[in-house]
């Protein structure tokens, strides 16, 4: 008997300002790995998290 997929899935959050900003502290793009509940949050997730490359809290969006 096969188990069903859980409601929680792993997602990657990526900084939106790192892709467009050229005046960064260091090269690279900030990414966080987290979980989300598929039933409670069916749309793409956006969180304000600290970006070490931009050296400030920025919006991080879910990527595929």
From Swiss-Prot:
<dbReference type="GO" id="GO:0009507">
    <property type="term" value="C:chloroplast"/>
</dbReference>
<dbReference type="GO" id="GO:0003735">
    <property type="term" value="F:structural constituent of ribosome"/>
</dbReference>
<dbReference type="GO" id="GO:1990904">
    <property type="term" value="C:ribonucleoprotein complex"/>
</dbReference>
<keyword id="KW-0934">Plastid</keyword>
<protein>
    <recommendedName>
        <fullName>Large ribosomal subunit protein bL33c</fullName>
    </recommendedName>
</protein>
<comment type="similarity">
    <text>Belongs to the bacterial ribosomal protein bL33 family.</text>
</comment>
<dbReference type="InterPro" id="IPR011332">
    <property type="entry name" value="Ribosomal_zn-bd"/>
</dbReference>
<keyword id="KW-0150">Chloroplast</keyword>
<dbReference type="GO" id="GO:0005840">
    <property type="term" value="C:ribosome"/>
</dbReference>
<dbReference type="Pfam" id="PF00471">
    <property type="entry name" value="Ribosomal_L33"/>
</dbReference>
<keyword id="KW-0689">Ribosomal protein</keyword>
<dbReference type="GO" id="GO:0006412">
    <property type="term" value="P:translation"/>
</dbReference>
<keyword id="KW-0687">Ribonucleoprotein</keyword>
<dbReference type="InterPro" id="IPR001705">
    <property type="entry name" value="Ribosomal_bL33"/>
</dbReference>
<dbReference type="InterPro" id="IPR038584">
    <property type="entry name" value="Ribosomal_bL33_sf"/>
</dbReference>
<dbReference type="InterPro" id="IPR018264">
    <property type="entry name" value="Ribosomal_bL33_CS"/>
</dbReference>
């Amino acid at each position: 008997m096969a188990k069903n997929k859980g409601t929680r899935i792993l997602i990657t959050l990526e900084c939106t300002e790192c892709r467009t900003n050229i005046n960064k502290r260091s090269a690279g793009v900030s990414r966080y790995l987290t979980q989300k509940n598929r039933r409670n949050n069916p749309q793409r997730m956006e969180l304000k998290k600290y970006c070490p490359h931009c050296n400030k809290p920025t919006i991080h969006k879910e990527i595929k």
